[in-house]
A protein has these predicted regions:
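Charge-rich amphipathic alpha-helical interaction elements
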Residues: 1-126
Length: 126
């Protein structure tokens, strides 16, 4: 077991969840913008791009939800362990925290790529 600053771990979890919530709101709005773009006359070759973006928004919104829930459960686990183990965490819990951070960074990179791809699509269709 390792003595750890719970406020730092909880703070990181809160930050990750807040950022994921912001991405969720952004991509929900982007789905609406995409539907509005489809309402305009688009060349047939753009419909494949629309379908790709719709699929990506759907998949990434699911990924955001799943990771947010995993972080929330981890944060609860950290708090429970700290209370029941006199302020100490199991090594596995710290490893889980690091793994969640890696997952968060990977998802954030994917989300930024999707944001860039979508903005490029909007520029090409307007």
């Amino acid at each position: 077991m390792v003595q750890t600053d719970i406020s730092q771990l909880s703070g990181e979890c809160t930050t990750w969840r807040t950022n994921l919530r912001n991405y969720r709101e952004e991509f929900t709005q982007d789905k609406i913008k995409l539907q509005q773009a489809v309402g305009h006359t688009l060349p047939k070759d753009k419909f494949q791009d629309v379908e790709h973006l719709q699929n990506q928004f759907h998949i990434q919104l699911i990924n955001i939800h799943d990771l947010k829930q995993a972080i929330k459960a981890h944060d609860r686990k950290v708090n429970l362990e700290m209370e029941s183990n006199n302020g100490q965490l199991h090594d596995e819990t710290l490893t889980e925290h690091e793994n969640l951070f890696d997952q968060y960074q990977a998802l954030e990179s994917t989300l930024q790529e999707l944001r860039s791809e979508f903005n490029g699509f909007l520029e090409r269709t307007q």
